[in-house]
């Protein structure tokens, strides 16, 4: 046991920042990646609460995505990757929010089936820290669900690999399109 904590909510931004700070301080490595698994709602207004990640216990014990970004920013470390094993964390809004706290994001733009990510198939690639290996992580996810589907299950999934440094460019280009078509969009 490296450190024990009193009972607390893991979706509290101060708790998350402290645990990550402790983890980084105790580690001899200089590069870090994160895996988060839970429930999430992205920016969907039809899901309550909108812009939420995680659920600690029952009820509304969730963390708003902007608070999660703030918690990760507080550790003053840019992560090599964040893998979100949670629904809706691959949307553009979420990717833009996390653009300054990690280099790459691996996630699903839709629901993540109960099977989740097939960790045993891709852990050997995840911590190598290059885009080609992150692509292999995504391919293992695709292969896993293709295999389930071919076995007659109704399993399906989506996965995305997002290069965070491209998010500002995407936002800039999207803004140009919105301005250019504002009259059409108003209707």
Specify the residue positions occupied by each region the protein language model found.
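Terminal, contiguous helix-loop blocks that mediate binding/assembly
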Residues: 14, 21, 25-28, 40-42, ...
């Amino acid at each position: 046991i490296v450190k024990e904590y009193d009972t607390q909510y893991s979706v509290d931004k101060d708790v998350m920042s402290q645990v990550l700070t402790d983890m980084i301080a105790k580690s001899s490595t200089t590069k870090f990646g994160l895996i988060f698994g839970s429930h999430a709602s992205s920016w969907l207004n039809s899901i309550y609460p909108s812009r939420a990640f995680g659920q600690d216990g029952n009820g509304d014990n969730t963390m708003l995505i902007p608070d999660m970004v703030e918690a990760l920013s507080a550790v003053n470390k840019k992560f090599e990757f964040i893998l979100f094993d949670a629904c809706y964390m691959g949307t553009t809004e979420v990717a833009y929010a996390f653009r300054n706290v990690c280099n790459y994001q691996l996630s699903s733009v839709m629901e993540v089936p109960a099977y989740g990510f097939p960790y045993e198939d891709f852990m050997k690639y995840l911590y190598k820290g290059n885009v080609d290996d992150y692509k292999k992580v995504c391919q293992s996810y695709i292969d896993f669900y293709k295999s389930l589907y071919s076995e007659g299950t109704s399993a399906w999934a989506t996965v995305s690999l997002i290069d965070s440094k491209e998010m500002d460019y995407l936002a800039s280009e999207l803004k140009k399109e919105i301005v250019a078509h504002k009259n059409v969009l108003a209707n």
